[in-house]
Amino acid sequence: KKLKNTQSLIVSSLKQETLNSVVISFEIPPNFKKQYAFKAGQYLTLSANIKGEQIKRSYSICSSPKSQNLQVGVKAIENGVFSNYVNDALRQGDSIDVTIPEGRFVLENSASANYCAFVAGSGITPLMSIIPDVLENNENGVFVLGYGNKTKASTMFSSTIDELKSKYTNRFFCYNIYSQ
């Protein structure tokens, strides 16, 4: 049974983000662009038939609303049926059921707002939508991020964060904390 407000979307690309995580990009048909418009911080629920069982999981959107891309980051977890399916079996060109964006983890951006966030591991995914959105829409805003991971190699979105630090030199600061 299909979830409410769901369309079958084509995976336009799968990017290996770290050894055990991928970023999925979805192709949005022109007639569904409006339904799949999103606010930074929202999430999607993906649904797939895995070994005869319909499994669904929610993942935060990790692309900026201005980017015109709809992407989620998925980290494989031990015994995670859906996350391992996505990381090991899902391919570019495959179709997967995706709900329209939902959720209220969104910022009401104000012209003078400064932000600070602390995240660990794959908890970074909604912020990969929120941070660029804040910096693009608030020319005076500052965003400070404390980001915990096991190792540099296991850090999701490391290169994107480096690009943001270069682009917004005096406005975006990321402090990485490694446990190993």
Cite the ranges covered by each PLM segment.
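FNR/FR-type flavoprotein reductase catalytic core
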Residues: 84-180
